[in-house]
């Protein structure tokens, strides 16, 4: 029940971010290169990088700190980065998307469990945070010589911070959806 809902929530968010990044790449809005990743890598490698980038952007959208290439992304300091303004706005849209998905998950939890207790939201948030932390463990990437100047590029997140921030963020947003679905 709740574990399956948390997996679906993470998967949906990741999939939407991935599809939007692929579409952006295909129509020429390749934000991959804003992180210092060389445009000389093959299309197959670009899709591998995009699949990883989607995980980090989904993490960022959950208020986690993501290091991608030469950029450290964290929402409060986003506008201090050298990323283009349109990509910064896209990142903010991804934050809104994650909030919407978690809000809807809260509504679904309320509709399924019909309780005034915080327990379903708490359990969901624990599962969600553990899944996000697991993703951050398994999605560490180091690209040797993949930058414009031939330097190594790393993409990673801090596992402990991901666990904590994902729990807090998912609990707050899911709880709001959970409570507002009872509001008449």
Task: Put a short name on every predicted segment.
Residues 1-19, 113-126:
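Alpha-helical transmembrane segments and their helix-start/interface "positive-inside/aromatic belt" motifs
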Residues 6-10, 14, 23, 27, ...:
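Hydrophobic, Leu/Ile/Phe/Ala-enriched alpha-helical segments that form helix-helix packing faces
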């Amino acid at each position: 029940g709740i574990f399956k809902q948390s997996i679906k929530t993470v998967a949906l968010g990741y999939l939407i971010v991935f599809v939007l990044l692929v579409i952006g790449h295909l129509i020429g809005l390749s934000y991959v290169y804003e992180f210092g990743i060389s445009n000389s890598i093959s299309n197959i490698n670009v899709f591998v990088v995009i699949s990883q980038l989607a995980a980090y952007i989904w993490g960022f959208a959950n208020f986690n700190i993501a290091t991608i290439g030469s950029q450290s992304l964290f929402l409060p300091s986003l506008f201090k980065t050298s990323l283009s303004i349109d990509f910064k706005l896209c990142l903010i849209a991804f934050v809104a998307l994650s909030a919407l998905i978690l809000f809807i998950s809260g509504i679904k939890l309320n509709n399924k469990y019909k309780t005034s207790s915080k327990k379903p939201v708490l359990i969901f948030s624990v599962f969600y945070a553990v899944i996000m932390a697991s993703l951050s463990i398994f999605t560490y990437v180091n690209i040797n010589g993949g930058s414009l100047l031939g330097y190594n590029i790393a993409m990673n997140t801090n596992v402990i911070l991901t666990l904590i921030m994902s729990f807090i963020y998912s609990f707050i947003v899911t709880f709001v959806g959970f409570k507002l679905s009872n509001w008449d």
